[in-house]
Amino acid sequence: MYSPKRVKLNVTSGMRKRPETGENNDDLYPPTALARNGISPYFIGKPRRKIVVETPSDSAQQQPPFKSRSQQNGLDDELDGIIIDEDEDRTVDVSFSQKQDTRKLKSRPFLGEKSSFKLGEIPKPKEEKRREEPFTMRGFDFGSDDKVTKIRDKICDIVDPTNARRTDPNFIRQMHENTLKGIEVASNPHFKKTRAPTKNRAAIQNTLGTLYPSFTTAAGQDPQNSKFQVPLDRQSSSQSIGSLAGIPPARRAPDIPKRCSNPLIRKAMGMDTEGGGKDEKMSGLRAEPTLKHFDENIISLIESEIMSVNNEIGWADVAGLEGAKKALREIVVLPFKRPDVFTGIRAPPKGVLLFGPPGTGKTMIGRCVASQCKATFFNISASSLTSKWVGEGEKLVRALFSVARLKLPSVIFIDEIDSLLSSRSESEHESSRRIKTEFLVQLDGVNTAPDERLLVLGATNRPQELDEAARRRFQKRLYIALPEPESRTQIVQNLLVGTRHDITNHNLERIRELTDGYSGADMRQLCTEAAMGPIRDIGDDIETIDKDDIRAVTVMDFAEAARVVRPTVDDSQLDAYAAWDKKFGCLPPPSISR
């Protein structure tokens, strides 16, 4: 059985040294013998480098560093059958001729051959200095490029605006050469732009004296003779320092803190709390101490809900509803105009609920109240007091009442209040319950003053869904019923103002009979449909007909419109409203003819 022999690694050549015993390679393990000879395909040792044998002409010029030619030839024959073993501490001196061709000394790694380099001859590549080749232009003619041609044409327009030299061949050749020269200079990577020479003091002073001959300093002196002039050159440092000796040192301005616009950052830095942000003057509602705990975006959101009533709406614009209008005058208008009279037991209620079928004018009554009481009117919906962030809804409700108390007298009108103050149940979300609780506390809680002129006016068409606590806080619950026959006649007369018609009192009686059970919104839609009757009779002549030639609106148009526009309120809903008003209402139900 073959067994591998322990061999010693040759440090110089990287080969394994032959065993000292005279055994034959045939007696060794085959892979060991192949690896020892350096011809095994599995040999993973350090690869040897083969030195290309020199030509006779080159070898004749090179002299051996240690031995003569005869001794060297004998040494070459001796090295054909042995492997040189060198010690690690031995150093080899190598010298080459400067005229030797470096291409013949290239070495390449190989496997399976014996080393044939001479003793002391270790190839070393010759270092060559890299010469910097001069920049040369490409063979492409950039002068014929489209962009270059456009630029050259613009330059020609500046140089020769009259086009007198455009046909001159010398001018064309000169412009073409200048273009190529400019491209060559701009494309040269070694090109460095020369800096303009700096002007000395005398040149600058002469220039200033030429441009501004009558210029003097604030003291009336000549700027050239002034002792406060700044040195313009650095040639004499002693003169520069001497000229600045009389100038007092400039004091550094104190650092002015920048105003932070992000409310979250301002709150984190303590700039919105008491004692913070003293360098900044707060203005508007943000300066109020009661609003210091709210963010600026919350206050801005509440301010955006303040409605300015540009068109004044009177009680006469609200047809019918005499009982509701009388109650609202006593609750809202008169206490706001005479707060000295309505005090103590005469203090008005803080909550008024308007309920009834849709389209009866509840929102219009709210606009009329805002116009008549001359108070700050907040038009609030459920979306104004809700947020996707937990806890923000309660802050919005609290901020709403805080801003309203700062702008007394105030009226907070909440349309469709049932979506905000519906009955609390176990299945509702916790955030909705907290918003309702905060609203009820702000409406009538411990911190509310009894004589403050703040009114919450709510409107809903589903009063049976309101929470019990909310129903108690609305002391006045007014039923806004369907318009009575006289109210429907008044609505038709108000809507036909400005429209040509032939409606008489007898026709109004006919319209009153046709519109039984109609709400205020249904009456408006009926009048709009009747007013379109004359327009439909014109047909295709609408583009050419004169406005005065359009016929008037008649009772027949109302009869045709009544066939299209039907009442939107069901009798069962009217019965439910009447039952709730009988149980919780504050006004006697009006008599409605059906």
From Swiss-Prot:
Changing residue 416 to A: Abolishes ATPase activity. One of its GO terms (cellular component) is nucleus. Expressed in germ cells. Signal peptide: none annotated. It comes from Caenorhabditis elegans. One of its GO terms (molecular function) is ATP binding. Residues 56-73 have a biased composition (Polar residues). The gene is figl-1. This is Fidgetin-like protein 1. Optimum pH is 8.0-8.8. Hexamer. Optimum temperature is 25-30 degrees Celsius.
